[in-house]
């Protein structure tokens, strides 16, 4: 992948990706089996030793938001939505998880969502389901 090639070109010793504790059952590329297979493929792909790490694998998304807020992460410049477009849709699974994480972390979500996206109050009332 392009990320891997870039890591090799700058002689980085690690590649990190942001799988978190809530991802395992939902996304195949966040499961332990995938991470182990990718780590093996990376080791076989080049003479350089590059380690695949998942620093947030035991963190909830709310934990990540809390820590990001402490570090001053510009959340308005981050992207979660799977639908694409100019704004987050506010309705897809990742948008709902994002909104729930900010709510649980008690951090203001600076994300502009598309018109018609459900409110956090309505999502909370429906146990974070549409």
PLM region descriptions:
Residues 26, 87, 93-116, 120:
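Iron-sulfur (Fe-S) cluster-binding segments and ferredoxin-like electron-carrier domains
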Residues 15, 19-87:
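Catalytic subdomain that performs nucleotidyl-dependent activation
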Residues 7-12:
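Glycine-rich phosphate-binding loop signature in dinucleotide/nucleotide-binding domains
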Residues 2-4:
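Short, small-residue-biased leader/transition segments that mark boundaries at the very start
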Residues 92-94, 129-130:
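Amphipathic, soluble alpha/beta structural segments
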Residues 116-130:
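Conserved catalytic region of serine esterases and O-acyltransferases that act on ester linkages
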């Amino acid at each position: 992948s392009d990320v891997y090639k870039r890591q090799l070109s700058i002689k980085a010793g690690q590649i990190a990706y942001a799988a978190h504790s809530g991802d395992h059952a939902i996304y195949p590329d966040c499961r332990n089996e995938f991470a182990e297979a990718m780590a093996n493929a990376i080791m076989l792909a080049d003479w350089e030793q590059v380690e695949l790490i998942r620093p947030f694998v035991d963190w909830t998304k709310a934990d990540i938001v809390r820590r990001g807020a402490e570090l001053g992460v510009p959340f308005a410049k981050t992207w979660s939505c799977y639908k694409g477009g100019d704004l987050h849709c506010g309705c897809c699974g990742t948008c709902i998880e994002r909104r729930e994480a900010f709510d649980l972390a008690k951090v203001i979500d600076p994300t502009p969502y598309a018109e018609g996206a459900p409110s956090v109050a309505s999502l909370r009332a429906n146990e974070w389901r549409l």
